[in-house]
């Protein structure tokens, strides 16, 4: 009998895991995602522009990206049509954006084809499959939910294994629903097993405006009002109902930068760090919410020269912060481990 592989809560909280990485900041993280919309609504234009932005490292609307290799499986198009669309978007597409118009099916060689591509192009971080139905075999399954969940599970395992984002282009039901997510074609085995779901929906078929509904495990729910520019062939952002004056990661970066200005490396419990950076409590943070903010901001902090790790010492969970520009000069004297019962004053 194979025993259950378990981990106790204390060990789990003390284990360092790589933070979730984003292809498009705050919008498209690593994992498996669905983009659904009615036929001919402009899903493929949006998908192609997303691929182009990710390959070039240019922002998608207000959301930052970093240059990476991208694979777009355009299984309902020809290379000629893709070329035409690409020229409509840019005269200078990068060689890191790759296309294919034919592939094997999901349970008959596709995974192996993608694995081989990733081996040849290890900097790939985004794969778009347009459409999901093109890679699925004709189903006569007595349990469509199980079939949907099984197919999605294979693709999710592939995305998780390689820490990449896979975006599946899919269709909507014809029946309207107050909840756009309920309009995704198929059973909840599809939408429930993905990491994020996006629905592109027009209120009227002939309109050039639409709303992109976004929900997921690693992103906040948001509704993006979009308008399709027929000349540039780009969906342009009109508004974002999730806009904030300052992103939480930016605030955490500012607070920790101030703390690390005099000491390039500090280790302390969340409560002590919070007392040092916000003694008056103006930020409205608790030690738990402060620690949570830092964990959610690890990737953003690392990109801005602050590395974060976590460890236990004498029963306390310590947040370990290191400023990158002090790495060359770090000695044991620079490392400050704060005693929670007798913390020093840093004067920040």
Regions found by a protein language model. Give the residues of each.
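Conserved inter-motif catalytic segment of the P-loop NTP-binding fold
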Residues: 2-4, 10-12, 17-19, 23-24, ...
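Phosphate-binding/switch region of NTP-binding enzymes
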Residues: 19, 34-36, 40, 44-45, ...
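Pre-Walker A (Motif I) flank of P-loop NTPase domains
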Residues: 29-33, 68
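Hydrophobic positions on the alpha1 helix immediately C-terminal to the Walker A/P-loop
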Residues: 46, 50
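Gly/Ala-rich phosphate-binding loop of Rossmann-like dinucleotide-binding domains
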Residues: 55
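Helical mechanochemical/support elements of P-loop NTPase systems and associated helical scaffolds
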Residues: 78, 82, 106, 110, ...
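Short, conserved catalytic or adaptor-binding loops enriched in Gly and charged residues
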Residues: 88-96, 187-191, 301
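DNA transaction DNA-binding modules
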Residues: 226-348
């Amino acid at each position: 009998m194979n025993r259950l592989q378990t981990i106790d809560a204390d060990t789990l909280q003390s284990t360092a895991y790589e933070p979730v990485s984003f292809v498009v900041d705050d919008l498209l993280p690593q994992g498996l995602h669905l983009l659904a919309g009615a036929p001919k609504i402009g899903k493929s234009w949006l998908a192609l522009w997303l691929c182009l932005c990710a390959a070039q490292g240019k922002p998608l609307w207000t959301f930052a990206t970093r240059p990476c290799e991208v694979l777009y499986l355009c299984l309902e198009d020809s290379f000629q049509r893709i070329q035409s669309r690409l020229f409509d978007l840019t005269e200078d597409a990068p060689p890191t954006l790759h296309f294919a118009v034919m592939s094997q099916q999901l349970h008959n060689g596709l995974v192996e084809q993608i694995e081989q591509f990733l081996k040849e192009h290890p900097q790939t971080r985004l794969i778009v499959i347009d459409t999901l139905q093109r890679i699925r075999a004709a189903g006569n399954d007595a349990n469509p939910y199980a079939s949907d969940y099984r197919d999605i599970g294979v693709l999710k395992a592939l995305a998780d294994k390689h820490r990449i984002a896979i975006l599946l282009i899919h269709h909507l039901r014809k029946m309207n629903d107050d909840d756009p997510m309920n309009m995704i074609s198929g059973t909840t085995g599809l939408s429930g097993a993905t990491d994020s779901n996006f629905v592109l929906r027009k209120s009227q078929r002939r309109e050039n405006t639409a709303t992109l509904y976004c929900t997921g495990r690693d992103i906040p729910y948001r509704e993006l009002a979009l308008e399709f520019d027929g000349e540039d062939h780009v969906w342009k952002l009109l508004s974002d109902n999730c806009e904030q004056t300052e992103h939480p990661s930016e605030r955490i970066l500012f607070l920790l930068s101030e703390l690390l200005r005099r000491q390039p490396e500090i280790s302390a419990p969340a409560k002590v760090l919070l007392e040092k950076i916000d003694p008056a409590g103006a930020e409205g943070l608790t030690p738990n919410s402060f620690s949570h903010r830092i964990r959610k901001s690890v990737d953003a902090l690392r990109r801005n020269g602050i590395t974060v790790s976590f460890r236990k010492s004498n029963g306390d969970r310590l947040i370990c912060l290191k400023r990158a520009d002090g790495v060359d000069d770090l000695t044991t004297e620079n490392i400050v481990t704060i005693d929670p019962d007798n913390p020093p004053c840093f004067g920040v």
